[in-house]
């Protein structure tokens, strides 16, 4: 019994540490893009990230869910897209209840993108979605 409790404690601590590291990395990534882009609309990729067609229905479901759960007409979310086209970090522009934000984040994680490209190499990028 003691071993099970100890294992649970170790796993919980590991989860918290990883979550903090991921959060810090996300904040650093968003700060980097904020500094790079500022208020300007500039292209920093040869090919910017784009959503794959298979994610179109997921976006429609996201919009429907957001309309039912919030009072906002639309929600803007900045996402860091990794070099494989998977969203890894999320920043909501509006204030949203934590429970709703968690549900939206879970749904946003299912979206898939064609990654940005620089010199024929897939790279991490930022993408803003309106839901």
Predicted regions and their residues:
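Sec-dependent N-terminal signal peptides
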Residues: 4-13
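Charge-biased low-complexity segments
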Residues: 6, 18-131
């Amino acid at each position: 019994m003691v071993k099970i409790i100890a294992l649970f404690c170790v796993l919980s601590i590991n989860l918290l540490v990883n979550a903090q590291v991921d959060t810090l990395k996300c904040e650093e990534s968003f700060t980097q893009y904020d500094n790079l882009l500022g208020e300007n609309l500039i292209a920093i990729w040869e090919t910017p990230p784009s959503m794959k067609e298979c994610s179109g229905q997921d976006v429609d479901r996201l919009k429907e869910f957001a309309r039912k759960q919030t009072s906002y007409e639309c929600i803007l979310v900045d996402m860091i897209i990794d070099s494989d086209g998977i969203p890894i970090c999320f920043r909501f522009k509006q204030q949203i209840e934590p429970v709703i934000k968690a549900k939206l984040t879970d749904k946003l994680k299912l979206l898939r993108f064609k990654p940005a490209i620089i010199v024929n190499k897939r790279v991490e990028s930022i993408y803003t979605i309106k839901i």
